[in-house]
A protein has these predicted regions:
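Residues that recognize and position ribonucleotide moieties
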Residues: 4, 106, 154
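Conserved Class I SAM-dependent methyltransferase catalytic core
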Residues: 11, 16, 20, 133-165
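Conserved donor sugar-nucleotide recognition element shared by glycan-biosynthetic enzymes
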Residues: 20, 24, 46, 71, ...
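Conserved SAM/SAH cofactor-binding pocket of Class I
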Residues: 26-108, 114-119
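Short, amphipathic alpha-helical segments
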Residues: 69, 104, 129-132, 136, ...
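Hydrophobic alpha-helix-in-membranes signature
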Residues: 109-110, 156
């Protein structure tokens, strides 16, 4: 599959469960990153959201984490090929286990299927279903990792947003 091309960068997405999609691109374009110096993308996948934020902001550090090894490797390769490679970092780890600094902006296009048929592909199940990251676990991670004046931006379908709030 061909790379997804933006004006200043491209995103390779072969070998990952979730390809570049509308939800991630919308979140990357919509999130207010005007004052963020440290940014965390939970469930980075290909790294598209982190890349868009690195392009749009003056952030000193943008970290993308993903529990899936193939996704973290893909994001790392996309980060290395970008003009912001010195700002971006990909880490293979779950949101529940990730520790360290506090972030001014945390973003997530989380898995949101709760009560639906699981995919036969375990990578796709992890990327799409809340089996590895529930909304409660996401909340706890955000509260633990966000700076006192930080912001949290996420994108969910309407029916899941009602459940999330």
């Amino acid at each position: 599959m061909a790379a997804f091309r933006f004006k200043r960068f491209a995103v390779e997405h072969d070998g990952v469960a979730m390809k570049v999609g509308t939800d991630g691109v919308l979140l990357g374009a919509w999130a207010d990153c005007s004052t963020a110096k440290r940014v965390l993308d939970i469930g980075t996948g290909t790294g598209v959201i982190a890349l868009m934020i690195a392009q749009r902001s003056d952030a000193e550090r943008v970290v993308g984490i993903d529990i899936d090894a193939a996704a973290a490797e893909c994001a790392a390769a996309n980060f290395a090929a970008s003009p912001w490679s010195d700002t971006l970092e990909a880490v293979q780890i779950s949101a529940q286990e990730f520790t360290g600094e506090k972030f001014d902006l945390i973003l997530s296009n989380p898995p949101y299927f709760v009560d639906s048929l699981l995919c036969p592909d375990s990578q796709r199940t992890t990327a799409r279903h809340t089996t590895e990251l529930t909304f409660e676990q996401l909340d706890k991670a955000v509260c633990r990792l966000m700076s006192s004046n930080g912001k949290f931006a996420l994108i969910l379908p309407t029916e899941q947003m009602e459940r999330y709030i």
